[in-house]
């Protein structure tokens, strides 16, 4: 079985499928104007497939508000996943705001500022 680090190819396939299905379900099934535009960045499954950490970014809403809404709807989304996926165990969903995008933007700004200062000094 092919592995990426310690993650099996089956784990990766199921993670990808969960991410795809959840993205569609959040867009179509959750009608809360406070949610904003949610993008699922990744899904990390535990080896026993019992839990899934779902990392998301949000545009047009506060991340804390979006996380609270997604946490509130996790049971509903779990039941929809159970109907769509053909696997024995559908994991419990745990939503986490992914700050890596904001961190990358901040680092890019700092690099640009450093380069601008450096070119002025030359």
Swiss-Prot record:
InterPro entries: KH_dom-like_a/b, RbfA, RbfA_dom_sf. GO terms for biological process: maturation of SSU-rRNA. The keyword Cell membrane does not apply. Gene3D superfamilies: 3.30.300.20. SUPFAM superfamilies: Ribosome-binding factor A, RbfA. Its main location: cytoplasm. Keywords: Cytoplasm, Ribosome biogenesis. The keyword Protein biosynthesis does not apply. GO terms for molecular function: ribosomal small subunit binding. It holds the Pfam family RBFA. It is found in: Cytoplasm. GO terms for cellular component: cytosol. Monomer. Binds 30S ribosomal subunits, but not 50S ribosomal subunits or 70S ribosomes. Belongs to the RbfA family. One of several proteins that assist in the late maturation steps of the functional core of the 30S ribosomal subunit. Associates with free 30S ribosomal subunits (but not with 30S subunits that are part of 70S ribosomes or polysomes). Required for efficient processing of 16S rRNA. May interact with the 5'-terminal helix region of 16S rRNA. This is Ribosome-binding factor A. It comes from Cupriavidus pinatubonensis (strain JMP 134 / LMG 1197).
């Amino acid at each position: 079985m092919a592995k990426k680090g310690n993650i099996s190819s089956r784990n990766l396939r199921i993670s990808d499928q969960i991410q795809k299905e959840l993205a569609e379900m959040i867009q179509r099934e959750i009608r809360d104007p406070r949610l904003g535009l949610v993008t699922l960045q990744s899904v990390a499954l535990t080896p026993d497939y019992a839990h899934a950490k779902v990392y998301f970014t949000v545009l047009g809403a506060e991340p804390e508000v979006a996380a609270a809404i997604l946490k509130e709807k996790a049971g509903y989304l779990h039941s929809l996943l159970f109907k769509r996926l053909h696997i024995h165990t559908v994991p419990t969903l745990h939503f986490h705001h992914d700050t890596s995008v904001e961190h990358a933007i901040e680092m890019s700004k700092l690099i640009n500022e450093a380069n601008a200062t450096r070119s002025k000094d030359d």
